[in-house]
């Protein structure tokens, strides 16, 4: 009974808590995205060794966002962050055609993990401001997202440095997670 009243109270007056894991290959723009969402500004970043964690409040949701480094030597550590993850943000450099296959393989590997079976997937197709950036349809194709069964996913075009598309992505994520 106490839990019911407490959850009703938080639904009416409080912010809903969500655990979000943000991963992707190195130099995709994860840390830039995190701090653009958190601070509303561009920060100078260096490659993330380990992780950054920040709370991002947006609308009625309090996202705890874990930004984990993407260098190939660090990727095996991603699995340590999977537990209790409700939303997975996979950031891809839309301009990096040479590594899109590598990104697709890493994403598919993660989506096989049991701990992420219920997580919704938001792909940020980042760096859309660059002239050679892949369109959303091409990105969806290269990441083989259309083969995903029993998984809610969405691809959002973004430009982290300008902030374009970031809040639209959070809107989609919050709408999907609120349904659960």
UniProtKB/Swiss-Prot annotation:
Q: Which residues bind GTP?
A: 24-31, 67-71, 126-129
Query: Signal peptide location in the record?
Result: none
Report the Pfam families cross-referenced here: Arf
What are the protein's UniProt keywords?
ER-Golgi transport, Golgi apparatus, GTP-binding, Lipoprotein, Myristate, Nucleotide-binding, Protein transport, Transport
On whether Glycosyltransferase is a keyword of this UniProt record, the answer is: no
Q: Which domain of life is it from?
A: Eukaryota
Lipid moiety-binding region (N-myristoyl glycine): 2
For this protein, the record's CDD domains field holds: Arf1_5_like (cd04150)
PROSITE patterns this protein is in?
ARF
The entry lists its GO molecular-function terms as: GTP binding; GTPase activity
Any single GO BP term:
vesicle-mediated transport
Family listed? Belongs to the small GTPase superfamily. Arf family.
The name this protein goes by in its record: ADP-ribosylation factor 4
């Amino acid at each position: 009974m106490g839990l019911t009243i407490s959850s009703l109270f938080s639904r009416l007056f409080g912010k809903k808590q969500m655990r979000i894991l943000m991963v992707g290959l190195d130099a995709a723009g994860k840390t830039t995205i995190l701090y653009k969402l958190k601070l509303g500004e561009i920060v100078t970043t260096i490659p993330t060794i380990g992780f950054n964690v920040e709370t991002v409040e947006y609308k009625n949701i309090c996202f705890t966002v874990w930004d984990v480094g993407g260098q190939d030597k660090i990727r095996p550590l991603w699995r340590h962050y999977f537990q209790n993850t409700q939303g997975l943000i996979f950031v891809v450099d839309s301009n990096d055609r040479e590594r899109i296959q590598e990104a697709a393989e890493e994403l598919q590997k993660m989506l096989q993990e049991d701990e992420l079976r219920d997580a919704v997937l938001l792909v940020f197709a980042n760096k859309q401001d660059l002239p050679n950036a892949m369109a959303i349809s091409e990105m969806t194709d290269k990441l083989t997202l259309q083969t995903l069964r029993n998984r809610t996913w969405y691809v959002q075009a973004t430009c982290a440095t300008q902030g374009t598309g970031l809040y639209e992505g959070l809107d989609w994520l919050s709408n999907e997670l609120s349904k659960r």
